[in-house]
Amino acid sequence: MLVLHNSQKLQILYKSLEKSIPESIKVYGAIFNIKDKNPFNMEVLVDAWPDYQIVITRPQKQEMKDDQDHYTNTYHIFTKAPDKLEEVLSYSNVISWEQTLQIQGCQEGLDEAIRKVATSKSVQVDYMKTILFIPELPKKHKTSSNDKMELFEVDDDNKEGNFSNMFLDASHAGLVNEHWAFGKNERSLKYIERCLQDFLGFGVLGPEGQLVSWIVMEQSCELRMGYTVPKYRHQGNMLQIGYHLEKYLSQKEIPFYFHVADNNEKSLQALNNLGFKICPCGWHQWKCTPKKYC
């Protein structure tokens, strides 16, 4: 596998992957952030250049210091040739199978290769599939300003009752972590803090000034960790967040997407109402744990 460092090559790859969305959306979103300051210190691997068939994004080696931190040790994969993936994944310099890690992608065809290689290395695999949503409409042209206050200006015109909107920062990480189904531990707290330092987090404040609904963007441009305090559910808070975020991110030409469990009927309905499109390819995650950590 080749590591792509050249900014021109990364841009060519990025534009090429756009043609394979939604299946390529995970690596596409990660490369967007790699091109833009690369705050998570990630890198891009391809099996060949320019005629690539496999793309993997992963943290640089110095980032993966904790062998049990699967939040940091996350790989995103897209392939045009699933039959070649098993061989590539078996290379020790591609995937650090001795660590607890996550592999994420939007192709069900990744499953066989991941499981075969994991089994050969005595690694336990916990698999999850959810529904992938992407924006229905093409992104608008980029605006001239990069000021987040644009979103506040939109919000000031759309306040309802005693609710208002705000951007999150790292001080909100504890609250987000406490209510994130995949979090609630020290490693996830550090991960969320980092996401909120480097990417967009957005929430709704309730009548008493407390945060009642929120969502956070992560290193592959996915909007995750969405939560609404039970007392304030079914009041349109997440719809409000979704509406303004869609407008803001589209204006900035920042890719974004969501995954939702198939039994989360309220979120499914909300995203449908906002005009997001369900992608048949689905969203897939493989948490891989070496036997020594099971």
From Swiss-Prot:
A GO BP entry: monounsaturated fatty acid catabolic process
Q: Which UniProt keywords apply?
A: Acetylation, Acyltransferase, Endoplasmic reticulum, Lipid metabolism, Transferase
Q: Which reaction does it catalyse?
A: an acyl-CoA + glycine = an N-acylglycine + CoA + H(+); (9Z)-hexadecenoyl-CoA + glycine = N-(9Z-hexadecenoyl)-glycine + CoA + H(+); octadecanoyl-CoA + glycine = N-octadecanoylglycine + CoA + H(+); (5Z,8Z,11Z,14Z)-eicosatetraenoyl-CoA + glycine = N-(5Z,8Z,11Z,14Z)-eicosatetraenoyl-glycine + CoA + H(+)
Which superkingdom?
Eukaryota
Q: Where in the cell is it found?
A: Endoplasmic reticulum
Q: What is its EC number?
A: 2.3.1.13
User: Example GO molecular function term?
Assistant: glycine N-acyltransferase activity
Q: How is it modified after translation?
A: Acetylation at Lys-19 drastically decreases the production of N-oleoyl and N-arachidonoyl glycines.
Enzyme class (EC, first level): transferase
Q: In which tissues is it expressed?
A: Expressed at highest levels in salivary gland and trachea. Also detected in thyroid gland, spinal cord, prostate, lung and fetal brain.
- In the record, which positions carry N6-acetyllysine? 19
What GO cellular component entries does it have? endoplasmic reticulum; mitochondrion
Q: What does this protein do?
A: Mitochondrial acyltransferase which transfers the acyl group to the N-terminus of glycine. Conjugates numerous substrates, such as arachidonoyl-CoA and saturated medium and long-chain acyl-CoAs ranging from chain-length C8:0-CoA to C18:0-CoA, to form a variety of N-acylglycines. Shows a preference for monounsaturated fatty acid oleoyl-CoA (C18:1-CoA) as an acyl donor. Does not exhibit any activity toward C22:6-CoA and chenodeoxycholoyl-CoA, nor toward serine or alanine.
> Mind telling me which PANTHER family this protein's record contains?
GLYCINE N-ACYLTRANSFERASE-LIKE PROTEIN 2, L-COA N-ACYLTRANSFERASE-RELATED
Query: What family is this protein classified in?
Result: Belongs to the glycine N-acyltransferase family.
Q: What is this protein called?
A: Glycine N-acyltransferase-like protein 2
